[in-house]
């Protein structure tokens, strides 16, 4: 079928399979250009592997270090009459090119919060991956979590705490500057956000993997976080989501103490703001990203997801000199260091009050933001003919959980 973008709110409701494949190939090429190392992870599990930082982790492990990878995610496959989600096509492309490179690649499509997903992963590690993994990447960004056992559904809330938050934002449907107000989260919403987005599920995964004996000696685990700056703190770090990320920090400290006994470790990696399906949903982030992209591009500091993950693997987790990674006082790996530079943030703060609907495209990189957003779904690539027919029913080596 012929597919063009249709945007509703902060979601693009259509996806382009070939565009998604080209995006993945671009990330693979960027990774290969930095060389393949053999002194890093060999068997890698990525939980939340289909887009954003999770996908970039899997690409970096496979094509930067020659690792065998197993990915867990929740995506919708395409049919002959309807396109699937972008994540489905991303991983179909990854699987195709990983196998072509002689690498083991297997995927599980289902609820990554479920015990069934953990059981399936453990079985595959035992039967197909040599019995153990040496890196577990936790990269789930879901608004909803169904609790294993009870089946109770919890929802996260992107809300401030204590008082209504009002700030300048972009109405991305109309490309206009607006004042957005968000009511504060209730105590229940805060608690539920911690349950969905905190460290509880990460710990359940490590419990299950360790209990089954499928974590290698020296195994590492990393989960992703964002701290940001005072511009975004009210809605993020000081909001309900921030409470969840603090819980993630506490979880990392517990897991690190456990894994360190066998020569491994666990860390939270704090990453920079990038255009992903997750960040597009957070009020204020599109405007902040549009500003920080412009400033960082001008300073030659810009990184996308693949550059961030490449730096995480090569310069933090698996340093060539064999030294332990540099961490902050909370044992976090900081990849937001360039974004948080005083000159970058000073420029952001100076720019923030100046932006209006009229000068939005001129003063910020909002055009770049929109381009990156549509690219997430396979659109706006110059090497794809969007008026040509494209196959939407794409199959790959993926186990579907019931």
From Swiss-Prot:
Catalytic residue list: 236 (proton donor)
Gene3D superfamilies: NAD(P)-binding Rossmann-like Domain
Keyword line: Fatty acid biosynthesis, Fatty acid metabolism, Lipid biosynthesis, Lipid metabolism, NAD, Oxidoreductase
Catalytic activity field: a 2,3-saturated acyl-[ACP] + NAD(+) = a (2E)-enoyl-[ACP] + NADH + H(+)
Keyword Lipid biosynthesis listed: yes
Assembly behavior: Monomer.
Name recorded for this polypeptide: Enoyl-[acyl-carrier-protein] reductase [NADH]
């Amino acid at each position: 079928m012929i597919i063009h973008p249709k945007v509703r709110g902060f979601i693009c409701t259509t996806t382009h399979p070939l565009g998604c494949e080209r995006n993945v190939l671009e990330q693979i090429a960027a990774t290969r250009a930095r060389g393949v190392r053999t002194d890093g992870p060999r068997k890698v599990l990525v939980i939340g592997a289909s887009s954003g930082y999770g996908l970039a982790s899997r690409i970096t492990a496979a094509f930067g270090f020659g690792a065998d990878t197993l990915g867990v995610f929740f995506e919708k496959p395409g049919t002959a009459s309807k396109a699937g989600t972008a994540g489905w096509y991303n991983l179909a492309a990854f699987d195709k090119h990983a196998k072509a490179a002689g690498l083991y690649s297997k995927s599980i499509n289902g609820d990554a919060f479920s015990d069934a997903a953990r059981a399936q992963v453990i079985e595959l590690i035992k039967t197909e991956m040599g019995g153990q993994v040496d890196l577990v990447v936790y990269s789930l960004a879901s608004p909803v979590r169904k609790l294993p056992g009870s089946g109770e559904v919890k929802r996260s809330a992107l809300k401030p705490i204590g008082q209504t938050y009002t700030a300048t934002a972009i109405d991305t449907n109309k490309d206009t500057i607006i004042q957005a107000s968000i009511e504060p989260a209730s105590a229940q919403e805060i608690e539920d956000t911690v349950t969905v987005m905190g460290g509880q599920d990460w710990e359940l995964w490590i419990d299950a993997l360790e209990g089954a004996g499928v974590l290698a000696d020296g195994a590492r685990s990393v989960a992703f976080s964002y701290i940001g700056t005072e511009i975004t703190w009210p809605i993020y770090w000081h909001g309900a989501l921030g409470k969840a990320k603090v819980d993630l920090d506490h979880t990392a400290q517990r897991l690190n103490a456990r894994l360190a006994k066998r020569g491994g470790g666990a860390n939270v990696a704090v990453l920079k703001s990038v255009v992903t399906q997750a960040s597009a949903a957070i009020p204020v982030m599109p405007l902040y990203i549009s500003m920080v992209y412009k400033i960082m591009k001008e300073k030659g500091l810009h990184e996308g997801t693949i550059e961030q993950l490449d730096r995480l693997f090569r310069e933090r987790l698996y340093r060539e000199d064999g030294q332990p990674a540099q961490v902050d006082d909370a044992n976090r790996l900081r990849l937001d260091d360039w974004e948080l530079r005083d000159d970058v943030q000073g420029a952001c703060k100076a720019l923030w009050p100046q932006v209006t609907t009229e000068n939005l495209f001129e003063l910020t990189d909002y055009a770049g933001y929109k381009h990156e957003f549509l690219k997430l779904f396979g659109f706006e690539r110059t090497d794809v003919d969007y008026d040509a027919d494209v196959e939407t029913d794409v199959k790959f080596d993926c186990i579907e959980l019931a």
